[in-house]
Each structure stands twice: as structure tokens, then as C-alpha cells.
Amino acid sequence: MSERDYVLGTHDEEVERLGLQHRVWRPQVLDAFRRAGIGPGASVVDVGAGPGFAATDLAEIVGPAGRVLALERSRRFLDVLEERARRLGLANIEAREQDVVEGGFGTGFADASWCRWLLSFVADPRRTIGHVAAALKPGGRAVFHEYADYRTWRTLPPDPEVERFQSLVERTWRDSGGVTDIGLDLPGWLTAEGLEIVEIRPLIHVVRKGDFMWQWPASFMASGAARMAELGYVEAGEAARLATALDRRPEGSWMVTPLVLEVIARK
């Protein structure tokens, strides 16, 4: 596949942004892993592993007796993942270059799976979920973080440039065959694949400028605006304004983050 097929790109700036994003969300991710029962000796599939920030966390959790199968179609991201694993001394990660729609992952070998902000982008999310269900052992658990209402992302009061960027995000994802609010369909799809819903949690935050989580959408706007210009959605001048919109908000400003659903299901 071409690295250009990624709506958000696979360049160094995107790797850096994904690292920041993972650091912001890491406490909630680790809590989800704990509640899903992921522990030493487990076999876990990371579906759409990207540069491997969650995969390396999982590898440390499951330990030498466990295994992490990191599935990712971008060779660029896998190179970053493998280098990170070497640097951390983690020999229990198998990094596999694979389109998570086109090929299955294996049958009945995984104690758990992890998937974050992937289903919004893939051509056939139902098929991907079928692969997840097939890979799990009986009793295995699937953990997902997916958007359920992207339009909750608002500044207080609303900022026209943030609103404009949000609409462009939805358009670019839609044009590439994706759906922003894929989390709304997720519980029904999992049930149809024979999985039992264990827990659904809403993950949404109201933060002030200067809060660590503020950096998550701010960094997305900075890199995403440039990517939109590269793809021809905006002119360079508008991209520059959109990139710094959250940085230019007054001190003490408030923001609501996009609504993410955490779904844990059991086979």
C-alpha cells in the first residue's frame, strides 16, 4: 500500500503526534487493559498498532511469557515500532505488516485484543471485527476506543476555526471511506459476531488551556491542517490559521473533547 493512503499520513510529525496522543490517553488505556484482565502471560492482538506505543505497553504488561501480535499495514510505522521494541528490550512483540480488513489474524489464540481509532478509517469495519472475534479464545476480551460523537469537540464559546477544522476532518474521513462516529455501531456489530458486551463507558473531558489533554486536539490541528493542505482540502493560508487556532485561544479557555466510547466485549 502507499503511505499516502493514510488520511493523516505516516511522516515523522505524525509519529510524534501519535506519541503525544498516547501519553495523554495512557492512564485510561492502562485502566482499560486492567479491567479487561490483561496480565502476565497473556496473548494480545493490537489491531492497527501504528508506531507501537500501545503495543510496547502491552508487551511490558504481559511480560516474557506473553505475546503481542501487532498488526499494521504501514511499513513506516512498523519500522518505528520495531526500533522502539529493540530500544526497550522487548522481544515478545511480533510486528506483522497486514491490512486488518483483507486478512484474518488467526483462530482462537488470543486472550485479548486492543483497537483504538481504527474502525473509523478502514473500508470494512464489520469484517475487521469478524477477524477480531475469530482470533479470540473462548472467554477472551476485546477492548475498543472509538469515536461516538465527534461533534462534541467544541470550545467554550465556539471558535469558528475549530468548527471549520472539525467539519473538514469529517469530510476527509468520509471521502476516504471512513465514518467518524463508528462507535455508535460497534456494540451491535460485536453482538452479531457472538461477543457479549461486558462494559461500555463514555470517555469525554472538559479541559482548560494549559491542561495536558488540551495538547491532544491542539497537536492534531497543527499536523492535520498541513495534511489537509497537502491533500488539497484547504489553501496554505487557511491551513496556517487552522494549525494555530487552539494556541491562539485566550488563557483560561475551556474545551470539550470528542466523545469516545470504551467498549469491552467477551467471547
Question: Where are the model-predicted features located?
Answer:
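Conserved alpha-helix/loop element of class I SAM-dependent methyltransferases that forms part
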Residues: R23-A42, D57
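Class I SAM-dependent methyltransferase SAM/SAH-binding core
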Residues: V45-V47, P51-G103
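Conserved catalytic/acceptor-binding region of the Class I
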Residues: V143-D211
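A short acidic, Gly/Pro-enriched loop at the edge of an enzyme's catalytic core
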Residues: G104-A112
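Conserved Class I S-adenosyl-L-methionine
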Residues: T180-D181, T191, V198-K267
